[in-house]
Amino acid sequence: SEAPAETAAPAPAEKSPAKKKKAAKKPGAGAAKRKAAGPPVSELITKAVAASKERNGLSLAALKKALAAGGYDVEKNNSRIKLGLKSLVSKGTLVETKGTGASGSFKLDKKAASGEAKPKPKKAGAAKPKKPAGATPKKPKKAAGAKKAVKKTPKKAPKPKAAAKPKVAKPKSPAKVAKSPKKAKAVKPKAAKPKAPKPKAAKAKKTAAKKKK
């Protein structure tokens, strides 16, 4: 009865981390939604101002109506709209035609509008750095050249074999050298034979001297 109780206990512990993972995913998804809704405030403002046909510029009230029509929560993001307008004016994207601060009327600067269109070719210029990525395949070619060099090295290997051939001839010469000492040994005993009679002659001289006495 104790064994099944032990096996049943770890099961709920395994399920709990899975729930934590699901809970962790939810705030991440919410943060992604907030990010998607947050940053484009300035973009929405520029689009609304560009869409307006008023020569004197778009007022804040008209801008809010345009944003609300696009599904943007104007009441909650009122401060963001004002900050977005100020930042766009400071950048030169919008020109304030009437009033001061965020309470005036705003118009899209023609120079800024043309400047916004120009960054698109800059993106094409940003695509130029991709060429170095195309240059990277050249490295494998160098590696292929290295492989060719490796293939050439085995051709050099036969040369040491040719050098090994004289080594085969060298063992013959020590054999000749081995024969020559044998001859020298044969000569030495011959030279020793004449040495033997010399002491005999010396003994003969000594005996002759004794006889003279």
Curated annotation (Swiss-Prot):
Bias class Basic and acidic residues marks the residues at 107-119
PTM info: H1 histones are progressively phosphorylated during the cell cycle, becoming maximally phosphorylated during late G2 phase and M phase, and being dephosphorylated sharply thereafter.
Protein's name in the database: Histone H1.3
Query: Where in the sequence does UniProt note compositional bias of the Low complexity kind?
Result: 1-15
Described function? Histones H1 are necessary for the condensation of nucleosome chains into higher-order structures.
Species source reads Oryctolagus cuniculus
> Which taxonomic lineage is given here?
Eukaryota, Metazoa, Chordata, Craniata, Vertebrata
Q: Does the keyword Zinc apply?
A: no
Record-level GO cellular component terms? nucleosome; nucleus
